[in-house]
Structures are given as structure tokens and as C-alpha cells.
Amino acid sequence: MESIIARPRTRSSAKEKTQTMSAKKISANGNNIAVQAKSKRNTPLGVIKLARLHTLESLLCVYPAIWGACLSAGSHQKVFTPSSFLSVLFANWISMTIAHMAFCTFNDIVDRNFDGKVERTKVRPLPAGMISLRSAIIAFIVEMGLTVYISYATLGFDGALVCAPVWIASTIYPFMKRVVQWPQLVLGPIIGMAVFPGWVSVAGNLDTLRDAVPMFLATSAWVVYFDTIYATQDTNDDKKIGVKSLAVLFHNHMHQFLGFLGSIQIALLSFTARKANMSALFWSLGVCVWGLNIPFHLLSLDTKNPKTGGKVFLMNILLGLWITIVCVIELWTTTVMHLDVNDFLLKTVVHNITLTAQNIRSSVAF
């Protein structure tokens, strides 16, 4: 009897030992994961990467602000000293860069669970364990505080006031990817609104802000355009995990959709340039170059090859840089040097034609 009763106890003890060993293994594995996460931790680098300071992405927010300043100067026939000119450029650059840092950090905080499931984004600081969630939240709070302070200090009250809708909308954007098919249509106006602080930084008030609306719409269309291209890199992963985007929605009609957006950009940019009295320099090196880039982007994008999406996205960053350089040159020549660019270009062309004709005549006579 004793032996029969003892057997179940032995089996029970064996089960308890097995369960105990399993629990220890799970605990050990959990500790190993925690140790591995801590070993990867590099909070300063994590803050930098969350803020995208290691990339050129912040320029995408700076560009519209500089464009707005340039167009505002043309509309208001402003005159700048070299120092005031540089002050306007610096104010727009620093305020937009800090804001971009804050909201990229916020975006990664919200997306941390999704990012770990996508091949391209699983190496981002939070899913990779480079920075803790607590540290990321602290970084966002500090960056947001700097955003408000620096915008007010450099752009003034009116400038900070027109930035406020951008800040509010930026906190909504990460959640839109879970709800609708078109988060790019939210991101477009958010970045496009950077035109308004640039405009106000030159105008000095909100009285003529409505004149900046066409450029705001052109920029918004451009942002939707390049962000849809960017999203083509993740179309397959996005479909698997349920993330929605225009790249998923228009996957089979991508080139037609992008061509439509490109046409809107050029039409609105041309309208804005005409209203703001832009010179032949802006028309030839700005509007025309932008227009020529659209078909080149479409030819370079292959939706079956995700890597081309990243390359065409980079092309758009460089295109934005080119347009910004043209705007700065336009702003400098017309508002600081007080040069009539159209007259200067006309005289230059006539002078070169005359020299060419003289050289041809001399060659024939010889």
C-alpha cells in the first residue's frame, strides 16, 4: 500500500521539478534578453537617431519655410541687409529642425511595436533596445520644449502662432496609419504648413498669410508625392501587419497617381511664382527644373524593387535642396543686392549673343 501511494508522490515531485526547471529556463531566457537589450543600450546615440540627426530628413521641413520666406519677400518687395537676410534664414532653419527632431522622436515612440515587425525599421533605437522608452519620452519632452521656445525666440509671436497647428497635427500623424488608407494626406499638410512661418518671418504679420496658400498646397502635394514613394519600400511588410498607406492603396496604379500629384505641384508652383513676381532665374532654374524631375522620378521608380523607392526619395531631398538654393539666390539678388534679375539676364543673353555673332563673323572673315 505504501509503495502504491508513494508512486504518485514521486510522479508529482518529478512534475514539480520539471516545472521548476522550465520556470528557471524561462527566467534565464528573460534575463538573457534583458542583458542583451542593456548591452545594446547607447542612450546618446539613441536620442540622435530618434531625432533623425544622422540623416538629411530634417531638410524636408526646412525647405518649405525658406520657400515661404522667398515668396513673401517677392510679394512684399522687401529689402534686407546681409545680416537681416541671414537672420531670416537661420530663424527658419533652427525652428524647423528642432520641430522635426521632436516629432520624429514622438513618431518612433508611437510606432515602436510596429517598427520591430518591419525589416527596414526593426533596427531603429526603440525596437533595437538602443534606448529605453522612458529615456525616449524624456527626450521628446525636452525637444518639444525647445521647439516652442526657439520658435518664439526666432520667429516671434506670430511665427510661433502659425507653427502651433503644425505641432498639434504632428502628434496625430503616427496614429493615422492605423486608421485610414491615406496617412500621407495628413503628413502633406503638416510639412506644407512650414511655408506659413517662413512667410510670416518676412511679412512680419498675419495680414497677407492667405497669399501663401497656393505654395502651401504645392508643398503638400510634393510631400504626399515623395512620402508615397518612400512608403513603397515597405509595401509588402505593411500589408502583412495591417499598416495602411497610399503606397498600399495605389500599389497597382502607382505611376498614374504620382504623375497626377506631379502635375498639381507644377501648376500650383507656377501660379505662386507668378503671384509673387519671381524673376526669370526662379522660373528657369526652379519651376522648369522641378517639372523636368517628375518624369525622371517616375521612370526611376520600380514598385517591384523596394530599393528604388529609397533612391527616388533621396532624389526628392536633393531636388528640394536645389529649389532652396535657387530661392536663396533669388532672395539675395533681389532683396539684398537690389538687382533686377530679369534685366540682368536679358543683358547677359544679349551680350553673349553679340559676342557669339562677332566671333562667327571674325571666323568667316578669316
Curated annotation (Swiss-Prot):
Region (Disordered): 1-22
Membrane topology reported for the UniProt record: Multi-pass membrane protein
Phenotype upon loss of function: Abolishes the production of arthrobotrisins A to D and asthrosporol A, and leads to the accumulation of 6-methylsalicylic acid, toluquinol and two new toluquinol glycosides. Shows substantial reduction in conidiation. Shows significantly increased ammonia levels in fungal mycelia.
Functional pathway: Secondary metabolite biosynthesis; terpenoid biosynthesis
Cofactor: Mg(2+)
Chief location of this protein within or outside the cell: membrane
GO biological process: terpenoid biosynthetic process
Description of what induces expression: Expression is down-regulated by the cluster-specific transcription factor AOL_s00215g275. Expression is also down-regulated by the HOG1-MAPK pathway downstream transcription factor MSN2.
Location of the protein in the cell: Membrane
Gene Ontology MF annotations: transferase activity, transferring alkyl or aryl (other than methyl) groups
Gene Ontology terms: cellular component: plasma membrane
Residues spanning the signal sequence: none
Domain of life the protein comes from: Eukaryota
CDD domains hit by this protein: PT_UbiA_COQ2 (cd13959)
EC number assigned by the record: 2.5.1.-
Role played: Polyprenyl transferase; part of the gene cluster that mediates the biosynthesis of sesquiterpenyl epoxy-cyclohexenoids (SECs) such as anthrobotrisins and arthrosporols, metabolites that possess a novel hybrid carbon skeleton consisting of a polyketide-derived epoxycyclohexenol combined with a terpenoid-derived monocyclic sesquiterpenol substructure (PKS-PTS hybrid). The SEC pathway plays an important role for fungal soil colonization via decreasing fungal nematode-capturing ability.
Family listed: Belongs to the UbiA prenyltransferase family.
Name this polypeptide is given: Polyprenyl transferase AOL_s00215g276
Naturally occurring in which organism (per UniProt): Arthrobotrys oligospora (strain ATCC 24927 / CBS 115.81 / DSM 1491)
